[in-house]
Amino acid sequence: TLAAIRDALAKPALWEDGGATAKGRAKAAKNNLQARLSDPAAKGVCETIAATILANDMVRAAALPAAIARLMLNRYDEGMEYGAHVDAPYVDGVRTDLSFTLFLSEPDEYGGGALVIDSAGAEDEIRLPAGSLILYPSSFLHRVERVTRGSRLAAVGWIKSRIRSAGQRAMLFELAGALADLAAAGAPAATRDRLANLRNNLIREFGD
């Protein structure tokens, strides 16, 4: 549960300088704390979160995951931030097609700390309730704004998709949504089967 995850991350000794894992220009931009992944509690939390994410129907439809790279647990205390950056193309040998942030703190527990994603020149500021996940292409420029009060806890990670192209993934996600809508509306099975077959064939066509 979310409460159990937060309890497991409450130990002060669990946290270290987050800049140790950043590379290139991101290293200079990163000012946060990161859970020691050698710690059994942190490792257990990461395994639980990864399994839950990969089992989620919405994530499976949107990401079509082939693999998930290691997760990181981070904490931003007052004055900490992560400047604008693009995630590395590979993490632990896994191609990063999609990045995600799972919020572990409620928005009223900290000030500032918004995840800001630059999508085609338009910026979206994201502060979601604890337990909420945002999934976005790893090619997007993004940052975490300075925390002005309290502490912001989150899990971040990366997914390799079976579909490399973000545009193709978006089309397949729309088809999955249409199939769900047709099922809810009681559409004939033959109609739904034709659309499902089309989606499966597109996955074959688009897939690596």
Language-model segments: residues:
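Non-heme Fe(II)/2-oxoglutarate
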Residues: 1-65, 171-208
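Catalytic core of non-heme Fe(II) oxygenases with the double-stranded beta-helix
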Residues: 57-173
